Amino acid sequence: ESSLQLLPQSRVLFIGSCFADHVGQRLAACLPSNQVCINPHGTLYNPVSIRNVLATYLADDVVKPFSEAGFFQLDSDEWRHWDYATKYTASSRAALATMLREEWQLTADFVRRADALFITFSTDHVYCLREGEYRDACVANCHKQPMRLFREEVADWNTLCAQWTAFLSAYHRDYPKQKVIFTLSPYRYAKYGMHENALSKSRLLLLIDSLCRDFGSFVSYFPAYEIITDELRDYRFYASDMLHPSEQAIDYVWEQFTTWAFTPQLTAYARERSAILRDMQHRPINPNSEAHQQFLQRLTEKKRKFEAKWGSID
């Protein structure tokens, strides 16, 4: 049963794997653009990296917004950071630092006003640097660098549990009105073998279950993984690579999610807003026709009524 009740004014942060992107983008289509923030650090997959970046938003964190040791330079002379995904690239270390600091500040402002935090784990396999100033650090992304630079390992379950318990305790202290919702990505890690993929998902499920039990209504779990693997349970609902869920499967999960998390107010708001936005995207064959002018008048009236009821549609 959900402890989350999303309203038209709710502000939601999504962080984690590609599945967080998919669900986040669908929610963003239902709400004004400034009320949904999706993967501000880029796509993240493992619970170590996700916790590391979220910890920078705690009130007493002393490593804001990134570790200076995490910068590195590609052969192409571009600069990246091991705690951020590949979309953050700059021609100099200083330029990248400025970019990351600005993005972090925007996210920090959002976190302080957020109502819910969605976290999607994907795997407990992590990659740690073998050498350099950031040696032994778990990277958020390998940035297509040679695998000889990394040590692959399975994150220790007891350590994960202790770290996430400490983090959630601090997060609840700093943001007591927020809800935290975990999900598990249904992506299948064939590169580890299907047996190890199953074990990895099981360990993450046990971690999430332990956290949900310890934190009561503050932390909950939405069963996207089970919906696809147990309810749909058919390769028809996977993409052509047989690893990613298909658009049809994601749409089905989204329908279940709206039932689970949406209040009646948000359901009505999203339905009315979607209809108006769809009409606004209409491209007429003859813009000067009487029929189109009448259509525009009806659209203007729809927008007026919507904004009188709900506020700005943007």
Regions found by a protein language model. Give the residues of each.
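Extracellular glycan-modifying ectodomains
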Residues: 1-314
